[in-house]
Amino acid sequence: MQIQSNGLQLEIQVDGPEDGVPLLLIAGIGQQLIDWPDLLIAHLLDSGFRIIRFDHRDVGYSQNLKELGVPSIPMEFMKSMIGLGVNAPYKLSDMAADAKGILDALGIAQAHILGWSMGGMIVQRFALAYPQSTLSMTCIMTSSGVAKTRADILNLMRTGPSNNTFEAKLAYAMRINQMIMSPAYPEPEERMRARLTRSIERSLNAKASGTGTQRQTLAILQDAGRAREIHQIRVPTLVLHGNQDPMVGVSGGRDIASKIAGAKFVEFDGMGHDYPHELIPEMVREIQLITGL
């Protein structure tokens, strides 16, 4: 359903009982609400959560912001490398405000907040800006600053799909996902293809511009200094990370946990930048512990 949040129209989905424990899920860069693994959602619902998920601004059926344009990512990346300010059309703090607006629209004063990859960065911003609304914070496969990404993956991301057709987008997504998946738990190709096909078809049906991911990349680069602030976070914190993550190196998760008092860090051997079905039950057990379920 569509709601108004932070001055934008956002697409959200709420699952679980009205009296369930509210859990707001914040996805990664360019991710839609359907991109959360079905198995993870099922386990969380079985745990008694009321799950709120959404399409980020600039993604899926949420409001597109193509009128903001896209500054040169190579230029902005170089500026970030030498400590100059990054020209981002919007910030991760704006995206955290989107998430807060969703809770406000639903009449939820407090929630457990969980994010992965870029979503985990937004969760940190959320906890800093809205501690009174944050029952706990779970960061999965994310970083305290700009992620340390393997060079070949960065190069492919800069190249992007060869064109905007479904076939080109699927080929690109398959290649990226095969590069970042868990080496100890490789996702079957048929399951990966079906998952990505569903996501791309939904995005095309929503007539998303395809440039939202670029603006979100700039938001990540702009927020590189977050590591100097997160020591201020005083909410129960869980950090989950795989030690074979080529997209966001495990050092990012370790750094988050080292900077936040009382944070629990759980490292999964052989896990990359995805959600292996084999590890989801253990991940959910950790989430249950941090949320008190």
Model-identified regions with their sequence ranges:
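Alpha/beta-hydrolase
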Residues: D152-R228, V235, D255
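Short beta-strand/loop motif that positions the catalytic acidic residue
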Residues: I233, V239-H241
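N-terminal cap/lid segment of alpha/beta-hydrolase-fold proteins
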Residues: M1-Q9
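Conserved hydrolase catalytic core segment
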Residues: A109-K148
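Conserved HGGG/HGGXW glycine-rich cap/lid loop of the alpha/beta-hydrolase fold
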Residues: L8-I82
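Acidic catalytic loop of the alpha/beta-hydrolase fold
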Residues: Q244-V248
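Conserved acidic catalytic loop of the alpha/beta-hydrolase fold
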Residues: G83-P89, S93-A111
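Catalytic active-site module of serine/aspartate enzymes centered on a nucleophile-bearing elbow/loop
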Residues: A263-L293
